[in-house]
UniProtKB/Swiss-Prot annotation:
Sites of Phosphothreonine modification: 97
Cross-link position per record: Glycyl lysine isopeptide (Lys-Gly) (interchain with G-Cter in SUMO2): 89
Domain of life (superkingdom): Eukaryota
In-chain residues carrying the UniProt-annotated modification Phosphoserine: 43
Keywords per UniProt: Acetylation, Cell membrane, Cytoplasm, Host cell receptor for virus entry, Isopeptide bond, Membrane, Nucleus, Phosphoprotein, Receptor, Repeat, Ribonucleoprotein, Ribosomal protein, Ubl conjugation
Region annotated Laminin-binding, chain positions: 161-180, 205-229, 242-295
Further comment: This protein appears to have acquired a second function as a laminin receptor specifically in the vertebrate lineage.
Name the UniProt record assigns to this protein: Small ribosomal subunit protein uS2
The family this protein is said to belong to: Belongs to the universal ribosomal protein uS2 family.
UniProt cross-references to InterPro entries, sorted A to Z: Ribosomal_uS2, Ribosomal_uS2_C, Ribosomal_uS2_CS, Ribosomal_uS2_euk, Ribosomal_uS2_euk/arc, Ribosomal_uS2_flav_dom_sf, Ribosomal_uS2_vert
One Gene Ontology term from the biological process aspect of the record: ribosomal small subunit assembly
SUPFAM superfamilies per UniProt: Ribosomal protein S2
Protein source organism: Sus scrofa
Length: 295
């Protein structure tokens, strides 16, 4: 499909990207029309997709997209969450019309509908999940391109790109590869230099994971501020003025503080004491009488 041109051959870095994203890993089920794209079957039952055929079909799909004069006439669709961000990024890079989320039935066939469109080419992420736009495309003679897994039905699909269309990294990488090839064939970017856009921008991210990362970053920032505050706290300033001594041989004059005077008493005067020889009180006599009775 590449015409034996070295420029269009798959590079080693592209193969490494495919392997890292798991693009070559299919499912455990196999559609009879997808047998031509299978390289081998693993011992655990997972089919391995031939990446050479994937690259050839990717170039064919890019040529079909470039053949459309108006980029807005290309509709890219993804009803699954894993491909919605990739579809929007692809549309922003190539000028296509994205439909991310639920596809409204009748968009291609019902002319009185507000969202009615007449595209010239349709690209879907999953033929099984996006069966409604594929069915309507068959009614209006609309050519279609689809990212197909080993168990994907190929009905109403004109150009099938064999890949793993279930994983978020694989789907994002395929849309990134397709956008890069489209821009290269249009002459927007050069093949000699790498594309400055990273594939990570096309990957789907779970909102819960994003929220957890933001919370972790906020906690880390707060901890860092507290740690720095302990070490960078300003030292207390001593505002007490020190006495200036010109001649160190002279003593420092200490300011005199008046001493409060208290009245003095005559300690020689003895207080009057009671007569210890006096008879005990009546209460003591009563106690003595009580003890006498007990005896």
């Amino acid at each position: 499909m590449s015409g034996a041109l070295d420029v269009l051959q798959m590079k080693e870095e592209d193969v490494l990207k495919f392997l890292a994203a798991g693009t070559h890993l299919g499912g455990t089920n196999l559609d009879f029309q997808m047998e031509q794209y299978i390289y081998k079957r693993k011992s655990d039952g997972i089919y391995i997709i031939n990446l050479k055929r994937t690259w050839e079909k990717l170039l064919l799909a890019a040529r079909a997209i470039v053949a459309i004069e108006n980029p807005a006439d290309v509709s890219v669709i993804s009803s699954r969450n894993t491909g919605q961000r990739a579809v929007l990024k692809f549309a922003a890079a190539t000028g296509a019309t994205p439909i991310a989320g639920r596809f409204t039935p009748g968009t291609f066939t019902n002319q009185i509908q507000a969202a009615f469109r007449e595209p010239r080419l349709l690209v879907v992420t999953d033929p099984r999940a996006d069966h409604q736009p594929l069915t309507e495309a068959s009614y209006v003679n609309l050519p279609t391109i689809a990212l197909c897994n080993t168990d994907s039905p190929l009905r109403y699909v004109d150009i099938a790109i064999p890949c793993n269309n279930k994983g978020a990294h694989s789907v994002g990488l395929m849309w990134w590869m397709l956008a890069r090839e489209v821009l290269r064939m249009r002459g927007t970017i050069s093949r000699e230099h790498p594309w400055e856009v990273m594939p990570d921008l096309y990957f789907y991210r779970d909102p819960e994971e994003i929220e957890k990362e933001e919370q972790a970053a906020a906690e880390k920032a707060v901890t860092k501020e507290e740690f720095q505050g302990e070490w960078t706290a300003p030292a207390p300033e001593f505002t007490a003025t020190q006495p200036e001594v010109a001649d160190w041989s002279e003593g420092v004059q200490v300011p005199s503080v008046p001493i409060q005077q208290f009245p003095t008493e005559d300690w020689s005067a003895q207080p009057t004491t009671e007569d210890w020889s006096a008879a005990p009180t009546a209460q003591a006599t009563e106690w003595v009488g009580t003890t006498t009775e007990w005896s």
